[in-house]
């Protein structure tokens, strides 16, 4: 109808409505709905643009939660998908893996203590891993310590090498930030069998804090899935494409970890953030696949 009136400007709204078989009121209601829809889409895309500045790879489900939480925009998942697709804003996952574990070092290793455990609180199981970043032609490494219950990154260190002193710094950061209500309760430390985690100094630090030491049994990703998943999110959703100098890398990682911890909702955390669950200890949805039966970890720590 709008096209008709553009071609024939002398045709009145009443005449055009009669030609198409609907009333003038219905025409203006439809026009208003189209206008309101256009305004709503613009508002959604504007909010998505702001969110994506901090969370460049955030997907539809999490965007839906953040739009409602931070912008009071209630939009259906399918509608949001269509809006994002039409705007060319859908993202593809980046999947690459580089080996950072070298276990042929001859140092003592420890058994896997957590394959029969489902954590019931924060600071019950900490999982660790190392990921790499390619910066200005060099490989840099990020050492991460993650609370298994809340998925919160509680310790980290950026370095240009894989020595154990960097892993020690990440672990010390985790100790400094422990939730006070769990500080006197036992913690299991789970890692792969890399030399950093088997070194004399690192093991001494764990024992000084009365940690139970747990390690993977091999290359099975089921042995340390949470650490690998969190590392992948930090690296692929927040750090790539990595356009930063060596001097600015640590701050870039710091901002990425803050965005992940404090702003990104998790499906397995009832769409809460890791920081919220770590601080409050709220119950979580165990939506990841568990290959092992449930056991009380206090029996292991005694």
Model-derived features: where do they sit?
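Short, amphipathic alpha-helical "recognition" segments used to contact nucleic acids or chromatin
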Residues: 1-10, 45, 49-53
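Mobile genetic element proteins and their domesticated derivatives, centered on retroelements
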Residues: 16-17, 27, 48, 63, ...
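Basic, flexible linker segments flanking DNA-binding modules
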Residues: 17, 24-122, 273-285
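Conserved, non-catalytic sequence blocks in retroelement Pol enzymes and Pol-derived host proteins
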Residues: 57, 71-72, 118-120, 135, ...
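Mobile-element integrase/transposase regions
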Residues: 73-77, 81-144, 168-173, 177-186, ...
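RNase H-like two-metal-ion nuclease catalytic core shared by retroviral integrases
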Residues: 101-103, 191-193, 199-204, 213-235, ...
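A short acidic/small-residue loop/turn micro-motif
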Residues: 147-148, 158-163
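C-terminal domain-tail junction helix/linker
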Residues: 207-211, 233-302
């Amino acid at each position: 109808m709008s096209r008709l009136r553009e071609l024939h400007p002398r045709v009145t709204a009443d005449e055009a409505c009669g030609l198409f078989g609907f009333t003038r009121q219905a025409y203006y209601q439809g026009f208003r709905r189209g206008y309101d829809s256009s305004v709503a889409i613009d508002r959604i895309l504007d909010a998505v643009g702001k969110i994506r500045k901090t969370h460049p790879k955030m997907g539809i489900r999490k965007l839906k939660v953040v739009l409602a939480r931070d912008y009071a925009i209630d939009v259906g998942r399918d509608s949001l998908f269509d809006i994002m697709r039409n705007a060319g804003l859908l993202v593809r996952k980046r999947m690459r893996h580089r080996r950072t574990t070298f276990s042929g070092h001859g140092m003592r290793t420890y058994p896997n203590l957590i394959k029969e455990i489902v954590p019931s609180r924060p600071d019950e199981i900490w999982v660790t891993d190392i990921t790499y970043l390619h910066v200005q032609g060099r490989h840099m490494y990020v050492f991460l310590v993650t609370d298994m219950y809340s998925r919160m990154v509680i310790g980290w260190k950026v370095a240009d090498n894989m020595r154990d002193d960097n892993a020690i710094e990440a672990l010390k950061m985790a100790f400094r930030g422990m939730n006070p209500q769990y500080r006197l309760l036992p913690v299991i430390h789970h890692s792969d069998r890399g030399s950093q985690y088997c070194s004399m100094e690192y093991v001494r630090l764990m024992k000084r804090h009365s940690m139970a030491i747990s390690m993977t049994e091999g290359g099975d990703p089921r042995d340390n899935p949470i650490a690998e998943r969190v590392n992948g999110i930090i690296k692929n959703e927040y750090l790539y494409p990595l356009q930063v100098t060596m001097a600015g890398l640590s701050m870039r990682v710091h901002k990425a970890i803050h965005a992940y911890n404090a702003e990104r909702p998790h499906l397995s955390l009832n769409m809460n953030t890791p920081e919220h669950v770590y601080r409050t200890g709220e119950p979580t949805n165990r939506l990841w696949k568990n290959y092992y039966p449930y056991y009380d970890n206090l029996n292991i720590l005694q």
